[in-house]
Amino acid sequence: MKDLFLFSSLLDASHTFSYFFHIGLVALIAVIVAMMATRSMQLVPRGMQNLAEAFLEGVLSMGRDTMGSEKGVRKYLPLVATLGIIVFFSNIIGILPGFHAPTASLNLTLSLAIIVFVYYHFEGIRAQGFIKYFAHFMGPIKLLAPLMFPIEIVSHLSRVVSLSFRLFGNIKGDDLFLMVILALVPYIAPLPAYVLLTFMAFLQAFIFMILTYVYLAGATVVEKGH
C-alpha cells in the first residue's frame, strides 16, 4: 500500500500507525452507530434503531439455525454481533479512497480468530467439564484414541488459520483488485467494482459470524447419549 494515499499518512506514514489509526476509526464508527441506534428507543423502531434491530434479529436467526437452543443463541449474541460489526466496518472502510481496511492485515484477522478459538474452548469446558470435553477429541472407539486425539487437535488449530487467512486473503485481494481498477479506469468504470466489494464486505462478515456460532455449537451443544 505504499503507493496509495492514506489520510493517516498526513499524521504518520508508518504502517503501524496506519493500522492502529484505522482500527480506532472502526471502533469509533461502531460506537457512533450504537449510540445513534439506542439514543431514543421507540416501541416502533425507526431509522438506525430499525436497522440495528434487523441486524440483531438476523444474527439471532443465524444462531437458531446453527445452535438450536434459544438460550445459547442469546447468550453468545453480544460476541457474535460485535465480531460481525467489527469485521464489516473494517472491510467497508477499505473501499473508500484514502482509507485502508484493517482486515487486510493479518494482525487483526488472527487476533479475532484467536479470540473465537479461546472462547469456544472455554465455553465447551465450562459446559461439559474439562475431562468430558477433551474426551470427545478421542472419538467413540477407544482403540483409535491415540490416533484421533492428535488429529482433532490439529483440526481445531486449523480453524484459527482458516478463520484468519480466509478473511485476510479475501479483503487483501479486494484491496488489490480495487487498486488495479482505479489505476486503469479511475472514473465511471469502478462503480460496479464498488458494488461487488460492498457485497463481499457483507459476505465475509456473515461467514465469520456463522462460523463462530458453528464452533460454539460444536463445543457446547452435547447430543443425548454422549
Curated annotation (Swiss-Prot):
Residue ranges crossing the lipid bilayer per the database entry: 17-37, 79-99, 105-125, 134-154, 176-196, 199-219
Q: Which PANTHER family match?
A: ATP SYNTHASE SUBUNIT A, CHLOROPLASTIC
Q: What is this protein called?
A: ATP synthase subunit a
Keywords recorded for this protein, A-Z: ATP synthesis, Cell inner membrane, Cell membrane, CF(0), Hydrogen ion transport, Ion transport, Membrane, Transmembrane, Transmembrane helix, Transport
Upper lineage: Bacteria, Pseudomonadati, Campylobacterota, Epsilonproteobacteria, Campylobacterales
The answer to whether the entry has keyword Cell membrane is: yes
- Topology in the lipid bilayer: Multi-pass membrane protein
> What Gene3D superfamilies does this protein's entry cite?
ATP synthase, F0 complex, subunit A
- Where in the cell does this protein reside? Cell inner membrane
Pull one GO CC term from this UniProt entry: plasma membrane
Family membership, please give it: Belongs to the ATPase A chain family.
Quote any Pfam family the record assigns: ATP-synt_A
Gene of this entry: atpB
The GO annotation for biological process reads: proton motive force-driven plasma membrane ATP synthesis
Query: Where does it mainly reside?
Result: membrane
Q: From the UniProt record, which GO molecular function terms apply?
A: proton-transporting ATP synthase activity, rotational mechanism
- Function recorded in the entry: Key component of the proton channel; it plays a direct role in the translocation of protons across the membrane.
Q: How does it assemble?
A: F-type ATPases have 2 components, CF(1) - the catalytic core - and CF(0) - the membrane proton channel. CF(1) has five subunits: alpha(3), beta(3), gamma(1), delta(1), epsilon(1). CF(0) has three main subunits: a(1), b(2) and c(9-12). The alpha and beta chains form an alternating ring which encloses part of the gamma chain. CF(1) is attached to CF(0) by a central stalk formed by the gamma and epsilon chains, while a peripheral stalk is formed by the delta and b chains.
